[in-house]
């Protein structure tokens, strides 16, 4: 089994869901999310956000295909502040990690997101 450290850099795009990480195929067995950092660069606009894992094929108990499992709902992100999630999250084949910004998303590019993870093949 090989382990590779990776990171994604994203900038908010209004209320469109941003895919932070995905385990889409059988070449990657697992991903361990190490940290998610969200920085609100706006000087005056507060935001809230949701972070969830989408179970694409419905392989988990209790949900069907495309069920959303929330880690955060309406989490506060004040102007000029940073939110850091640094608890590990295990993801398997056909799981996707998303972040969605609130409808108060003007300016739309004010939240910068960095996701660090360990890819295990």
Predicted regions and their residues:
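C-terminal interaction-tip segments
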Residues: 1-31, 41, 55-58, 92-94, ...
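Beta-strand-rich interaction surfaces with strong enrichment in secreted/lumenal proteins
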Residues: 7-8, 22, 72-76, 86-88
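Short edge beta-strand/loop segments characteristic of extracellular beta-sandwich folds
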Residues: 35-39
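Solvent-exposed, conformationally flexible loop/turn segments
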Residues: 13-18, 76-82
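Short, surface-exposed beta-strand/strand-loop-strand elements in extracellular ectodomains
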Residues: 43-71
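Ser/Thr- (and often Asn-) enriched beta-sheet segments in non-cytosolic proteins
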Residues: 19, 48-50, 74-76
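Beta-sandwich interaction modules
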Residues: 80-94
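Residue-level detector of short, conserved catalytic/binding motifs and their immediate flanks
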Residues: 34, 49, 95
